[in-house]
Amino acid sequence: VTAATTKFSKRNSGQFAKLGDVCVRAAGAVPGNVILFFPSYTVMEEVHKQIHGKITKELLKEHPNMSKEEKQKLLKEFKNTHLAGGVLLAVIGGSFSEGIDLPGTLLNGVIIVGLPLGQPDLETKELIRYYDTRFSRGWDYGYVFPAFTKALQSAGRCIRSETDRGVIVFVDERYAWESYYRCFPSDMTPKMTEFYEEAIKEFFRKKEPQSHNL
């Protein structure tokens, strides 16, 4: 879905409103549980302001510096909402983006909001320089690919076995750019569409045990 972006230079109230609208519509079209993954807590909080009160499902949210017990409690609460449907807001690269198991109908959809491309820190800059010197592709190997891998790992929470079925929605105009689109693995070919709500509903009307990427 290319209707909005989390690109730092374009962040403003209008952009967050667009992101919120996509999240409300996409999450509402998925029956049962959905996880919204964000590139940072800052973006998550801004979008939360936009969707609070507009999503009929129960909203749960990851917080910075949560203890192991708090994370386990939040995960249990999320699992318990799967019949009526719940929406968990979490951060790409955080505890809920890796190492959790939500098989079957415990998770029917994942929405990746934006790309986790922050300001390069010293370590990242060193990696960029190293890969530039060695392969002349420092920006790709040291910055873009690691961020994209984190986004894909978060998306992978939705499909953990051959019998799982669910929808993965990538929300950001940059996913359509050639420089980023080529980062998707060969077995994942997202479809660009403005009509994502209907595409999601149509997927769940069918019975094929596979994932659908938007």
Language model features: what each stretch is:
Residues 1-214:
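ASCE RecA-like P-loop NTPase motor cores
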